[in-house]
C-alpha cells in the first residue's frame, strides 16, 4: 500500500495481472496497459513478450504511490559461472521503473557502473534514492582457479554452506543505494562493499530485511556477518544502521545472540522496531518485538504480553501503537500493541489467517485466507469489522461446495488439551462411514493454522470423500512457549503420542471408518510418516511421506543449516555421552523398517538441499526389499516444495491414486 491506493498481483493459469485499488472510491484499475508495456519491454529486452506472458517479478511501489520498480527475466542467455550448478541456461535480468499515471517505462541502468542482477527495491521517503539488492560473487569458480580448464564442471569445496535450500552458493545478496532522478540511477554504493556476507539473508529474505529512516540518509539492514562453518551453526544475525553521509555502520543488537531481523523506523523517526529471537542456533525461538529509542539507545521487549511469535508488523501513524499478526490457537489474527503500557489486544477474530498488514489511514489492509478460501484482500477497521476488497476467485467458489471445518480440543496422554482441526467432506452424512486421513505437520515448529495450500489442500482431500484430522501436536507455536519447545530433542516422543491421540479419538466416531485410515505429511510430517510406519500397530492402511527424514544420522550431516540439526536433534550422533542426541538418533525411522507392513508412497525433490532426496530413495528401497508395496515420485527440478504447475497436478493425481487404491478401496469390516 502506498499513498491513497494499494496494489496487488493476481495469478491465474493464463498469466498474471496487476491492479491498483482505491478503497475509498471503491475503484479498481489495471496497473499496466498490458499490450503497451509488453511492446515497450519487447523493444528494450529484444524478446517478443505478449500481454499474457509478461514475466514481471518483484514489483515494488515508491513512497509517492505512482512509481514502481520491477525486474524482467529475458530468454537471452548470459555466460554461466562454472560453480553454477542450476540446470538449464542462465538468463539476463533487466530492472525497470514505471510511472503509473503516465505509463512511462524506464530501464534502470547506471552508465558509469554496471551492477549485475538487481533485485527487490525500495525508494527513499524523499523519492530521490533507490535501495536495491544485487548478487555479488563471493566464491571463486573452478575457471578462476584453473583458467586453462574452461569446460571443467567440478566444484572445489573448502567450507560449509556450499549449498543452501535449492542452490549452490556462489554469490551473496548485497544492499545497494543509488541516486534516482526519475529517468535512471547513478552513484551506486554497495553498503557491504568488500564483505562476503548476505543482506538480506538467504534463502527467503527480501526487502523487508532493510529499511529507510524518515530523513532518507540512513539504511537499517539485517545481516549475519558469518561465513562457512560459523554461518552453518549460528542464527546470530544483527540489525545494522548505515549512514549514507559518513559511510559508517553501527550494530544496534550486538548483545543479542539469536536472530534479529526486519527493521522498521517509526513514522516520527524517533524509534526503530525489529523482530528478535534470544538464543543462538534456535530458529524456532520466540520471535519477539523490540523497539529502540534512537536518541537514548534504550531498548525494550514490547511484546511480552503475547506468548507467541510476532509475524508481520507495521507502525501506527502516531508511533504509539504497532499492529502485528500472530498465531494463537490455530488462527493468525491481527493485534494492536499499545506502546504506552505494552498491552496487546486482538483486533480480528474468527477461523481465518491474516497475513501481512499495512496501515491505510484509520484502517489496516491485509490478506486473509482459511482452509476454505485462498488469499483475498481485506480492509480491517480498528474495531475488528472487515470489508472484503477483492473477489478474484468468487466465480470459482460459487461453483464449489466446501466441507465443514471444526476445531476439537482433545485430552493428550499427559493430561493437556490439544486443538485438532477436523475437515469433513461436502454433503457430509453422519450415517455413513468415511475413509479418514491423519495429517502430520512439518516444520516441525510450524502451526496448523487456517492455512491455504495448493498442495496440502484439505478441501481437495475432503472433496475426494475423506475426513481429515489435523492436530496441533506438540512442537507448534500458538499454544505457549512450553508447548512449542517440547519437541526439540524428542522427535519420537510426545508429538507421536499426540498423533495417536488425534486419530484414536476420531476413530471412535461412528462416521469414521477405523478400517480405512491413512497417514500423510511433508518435511517433519514426512519424518513422522516414516516413524509411524514402524510404530502404528496396524492403525493405517497406507502412508504418504513427502520430503521426509528417513535416516537421522545421514540427515545430521546432509542438511545445510547445521544450527537446526544441532538444536532440534540435540547434538551429533557421535556424542555418545549426550543423552538427548542419543535419544534422537535411537528414534530414526530407518531403525524400525523391520516393522514396516503397510503400503507407502515416497515423494521428494532432487533440488531439496534441506532434506536430500536420497532419504526418500532409501525409504522406497527399504520398503521394496521388505516386500511392502511402495511407490516413489521423484522431481529432478523441485526443491523442498513443488512449485511448477504441472508438477503440482502430477502430485495431486499420484496422491489420490495411492490413497484411493490402498485406503478408500480397502475392505471395511
Predicted regions and their residues:
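N-terminal cap/lid segment of alpha/beta-hydrolase-fold proteins
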Residues: 176-178, 391-431
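Conserved blade-ending motifs and adjacent loop-strand segments that build the rim/top face
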Residues: 303-311, 345-356, 390-401
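Glycine-rich His-Gly loop
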Residues: 135, 224, 369, 439-443, ...
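Beta-propeller folds
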Residues: 1-345, 362-363, 371-373, 379-383, ...
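Short beta-strand element of the alpha/beta-hydrolase
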Residues: 424, 432-442
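Active-site-proximal cap/loop segments of hydrolase catalytic domains
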Residues: 457, 462-463, 470-669
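The serine-hydrolase catalytic nucleophile loop
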Residues: 433, 444-458, 473, 614-615
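Core-facing hydrophobic residues within beta-strands of well-ordered domains
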Residues: 56, 207, 260, 310, ...
Amino acid at each position: 500500500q502506498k499513498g491513497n491506493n494499494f496494489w496487488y498481483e493476481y495469478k491465474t493459469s493464463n498469466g498474471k495481472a496487476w491492479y491498483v485499488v482505491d478503497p475509498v472510491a471503491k475503484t479498481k484499475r489495471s496497473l499496466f496497459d498490458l499490450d503497451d508495456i509488453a511492446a515497450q519491454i519487447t523493444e528494450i529486452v529484444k524478446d517478443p513478450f505478449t500481454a499474457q506472458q509478461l514475466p514481471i517479478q518483484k514489483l515494488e511501489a515508491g513512497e509517492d504511490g505512482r512509481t514502481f520498480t520491477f525486474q524482467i527475466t529475458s530468454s537471452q542467455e548470459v555466460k554461466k559461472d562454472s560453480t553454477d550448478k542450476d540446470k538449464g541456461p542462465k538468463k539476463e535480468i533487466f530492472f525497470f521503473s514505471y510511472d503509473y499515471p503516465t505509463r512511462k517505462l524506464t530501464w534502470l541502468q547506471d552508465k558509469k557502473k554496471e551492477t549485475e542482477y538487481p533485485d527487490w527495491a525500495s525508494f527513499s521517503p524523499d523519492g530521490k534514492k533507490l535501495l536495491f539488492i544485487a548478487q555479488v560473487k563471493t566464491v571463486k569458480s573452478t575457471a578462476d582457479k584453473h583458467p586453462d580448464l574452461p569446460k571443467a564442471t567440478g566444484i572445489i569445496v573448502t567450507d560449509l554452506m556450499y549449498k543452501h535450500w535449492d542452490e549452490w552458493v556462489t554469490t551473496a545478496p548485497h544492499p545497494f543505494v543509488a541516486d534516482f532522478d526519475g529517468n535512471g540511477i547513478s552513484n551506486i554504493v554497495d553498503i557491504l562493499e568488500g564483505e562476503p556476507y548476505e543482506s538480506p539473508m538467504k534463502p527467503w529474505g527480501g526487502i523487508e530485511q532493510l529499511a529507510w529512516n524518515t530523513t532518507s540518509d540512513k539504511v537499517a539492514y539485517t545481516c549475519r556477518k558469518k561465513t562457512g562453518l560459523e554461518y552453518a551453526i549460528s542464527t546470530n544475525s544483527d540489525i545494522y544502521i548505515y549512514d549514507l553521509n559518513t559511510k559508517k555502520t553501527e550494530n544496534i543488537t550486538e548483545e543479542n545472540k539469536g536472530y534479529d531481523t526486519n527493521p522498521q523506523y517509526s513514522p516520527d523517526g524517533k524509534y526503530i522496531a525489529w523482530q528478535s529471537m534470544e538464543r543462538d542456533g534456535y530458529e524456532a525461538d520466540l520471535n519477539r518485538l523490540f523497539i529502540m529509542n534512537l536518541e537514548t539507545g534504550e531498548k525494550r521487549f514490547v511484546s511480552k504480553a503475547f506468548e507467541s511469535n510476532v509475524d508481520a508488523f507495521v507502525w501506527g501513524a502516531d508511533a504509539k501503537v504497532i499492529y502485528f499478526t500472530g498465531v494463537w490457537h490455530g488462527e493468525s489474527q491481527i493485534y494492536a500493541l499499545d506502546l504506552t503500557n505494552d498491552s496487546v489486544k486482538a483486533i480480528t477474530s474468527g477461523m481465518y489467517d491474516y497475513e501481512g498488514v499495512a496501515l491505510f489511514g484509520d484502517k489496516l489492509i491485509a490478506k486473509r485466507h482459511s482452509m476454505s478460501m485462498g488469499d483475498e484482500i481485506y480492509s480491517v477497521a480498528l474495531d475488528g469489522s472487515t470489508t472484503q476488497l477483492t473477489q478474484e476467485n468468487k466465480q470459482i467458489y460459487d461453483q464449489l461446495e466446501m466441507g465443514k471445518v471444526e476445531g476439537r480440543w482433545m485430552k493428550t496422554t499427559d493430561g493437556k488439551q490439544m486443538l485438532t482441526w477436523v475437515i469433513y467432506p461436502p454433503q457430509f452424512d453422519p450415517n455413513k462411514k468415511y475413509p479418514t486421513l491423519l495429517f502430520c505437520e512439518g516444520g516441525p515448529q510450524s502451526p496448523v493454522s487456517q492455512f491455504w495450500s495448493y498442495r496440502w489442500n484439505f478441501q481437495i482431500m475432503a472433496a475426494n470423500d475423506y475426513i481429515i484430522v489435523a492436530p496441533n501436536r506438540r512442537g507448534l507455536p500458538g499454544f505457549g512457549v512450553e508447548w512449542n519447545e517440547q519437541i526439540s530433542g524428542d522427535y519420537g516422543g510426545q508429538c507421536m503420542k499426540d498423533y495417536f491421540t488425534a486419530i484414536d479419538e476420531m476413530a471412535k466416531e461412528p462416521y469414521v471408518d477405523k478400517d480405512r485410515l491413512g497417514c500423510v505429511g511433508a518435511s517433519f510430517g514426512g519424518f513422522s510418516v516414516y516413524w509411524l510406519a514402524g510404530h502404528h500397530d496396524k492403525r493405517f492402511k497406507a502412508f504418504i511421506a513427502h520430503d521426509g527424514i528417513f535416516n537421522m544420522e545421514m540427515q545430521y550431516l546432509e542438511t545445510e543449516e547445521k544450527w537446526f540439526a544441532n538444536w532440534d536433534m540435540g547434538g551429533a550422533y557421535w556424542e555418545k555421552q549426550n543423552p538427548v542426541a542419543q535419544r534422537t538418533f535411537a528414534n530414526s525411522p530407518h531403525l524400525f523398517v523391520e516393522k514396516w507392513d503397510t503400503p507407502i508412497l515416497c515423494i521428494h525433490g532432487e533440488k531439496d538441499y534441506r532434506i536430500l532426496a536420497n532419504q526418500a530413495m532409501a525409504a522406497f528401497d527399504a520398503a521394496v526389499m521388505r516386500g511392502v508395496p511402495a511407490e516413489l515420485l521423484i522431481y529432478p527440478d523441485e526443491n523442498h516444495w513443488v512449485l511448477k504447475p504441472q508438477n503440482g497436478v502430477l502430485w495431486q493425481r499420484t496422491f489420490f491414486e495411492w490413497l484411493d487404491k490402498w485406503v478408500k478401496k480397502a475392505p471395511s469390516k
